[in-house]
Amino acid sequence: MTKKLHIKTWGCQMNEYDSSKMADLLDATHGYQLTDVAEEADVLLLNTCSIREKAQEKVFHQLGRWRLLKEKNPDLIIGVGGCVASQEGEHIRQRAHYVDIIFGPQTLHRLPEMINSVRGDRSPVVDISFPEIEKFDRLPEPRAEGPTAFVSIMEGCNKYCTYCVVPYTRGEEVSRPSDDILFEIAQLAAQGVREVNLLGQNVNAWRGENYDGTTGTFADLLRLVAAIDGIDRIRFTTSHPIEFTDDIIEVYRDTPELVSFLHLPVQSGSDRVLNLMGRTHTALEYKAIIRKLRAARPDIQISSDFIVGFPGETNDDFEKTMKLIADVNFDMSYSFIFSARPGTPAADMVDDVPEEEKKQRLYILQERINQQAMAWSRRMLGTTQRILVEGTSRKNIMELSGRTENNRVVNFEGTPEMIGKFVDVEITDVYPNSLRGKVVRTEDEMGLRVAETPESVIARTRKENELGVGFYQP
């Protein structure tokens, strides 16, 4: 009988990537098939996130539901991974003794051995160590699920912002070698992937090793990925202003595969609050980056992260944030009320902004961002946009849906063979959360590049001299 695996994922795109790798790994080693129904599963895995408020309590609430399943089926294996697991460790078993496996983001590749250990002697396993790059070396080949894919290029963060748990739960920055990344992307391209999203907690800090032992920059990597035939769009998430160097901006100037959309968190428009947050940049420095980006790519649209009600934030500080929002003309944002994360320096600060004031500031900020986003959408009315068709529309299964370069969802009438390909669509209607249009050109008329083999991608980045010694050539 087929063994079943159920994974519940909370949090960021990195967690989504990790969960997909868990599924591929346990399919390869144990033959587990994914199921959306927890009651059917032989193994339940909870991939957690510690960014939001009351993250720990949310975990134990979910585990309480799964405990009932374990009581009915004592052989059921329950595992907790992700950032809450890394943060809480053995404390999870103290509150939920029925949990069999606790693993961190850097030890998910050891899941097969952990499951074997639990199956063998029923003793629980806790592994929340940070074994650096080993995780990527032991994962199976990537498996495409549609025309878009996430590819993790690095883990961890060295910035230690005062409100953030990432350095404590995912460790410090570790970059994958460039060859490993390029080979994975080429494998995905060969399976029909057209758009890759390069992932990292601080993705533009990537400093991976090249095959010849030299250290590459993020700008180098972007150009190498753009050269892979079949990959027509590149996104990356999430970047830090302090690492947004001029060579990255130059890639926007000369590399059309890099989309005209950037998520660049700023958190606040007040230098005083930024200093309290440990952000190491000013609002003016942030605006200087945006100014240079728009000189290189005039149509680029920017999204960001904001925290309102940070300890010590005054009305004047908040007004400076609102001014930054207007000056940059952000297209969208992920914005939240401050809530202290245990173990961070900000948790020891006096949370002196009244809750109602926090809510009011968040409402004002989000309303302004929504107005700006709608203005950006209205500018697209009557224009022709290139859409990567991802599948059928959620609103109408008789229609197709895809995304523009600037991350707008567009619904339109089309045929099934368009799925996974690009189409040019004239935008005819604008709505708060989506656009509507009509197809004016199909991919057959675009002359796009055809995917090449992964081996040829690696070979193309190298060239041998007369002695047969390879050297790097982008």
From Swiss-Prot:
GO CC terms: cytosol
Catalytic activity annotation: N(6)-dimethylallyladenosine(37) in tRNA + (sulfur carrier)-SH + AH2 + 2 S-adenosyl-L-methionine = 2-methylsulfanyl-N(6)-dimethylallyladenosine(37) in tRNA + (sulfur carrier)-H + 5'-deoxyadenosine + L-methionine + A + S-adenosyl-L-homocysteine + 2 H(+)
Positions of [4Fe-4S] cluster 2 binding: C157, C161, C164
Pfam families: Radical_SAM, TRAM, UPF0004
Broad enzyme group: transferase
Binding site for [4Fe-4S] cluster 1: C12, C49, C83
Domain TRAM: 378-441
Protein name, UniProt field: tRNA-2-methylthio-N(6)-dimethylallyladenosine synthase
This protein's encoding gene: miaB
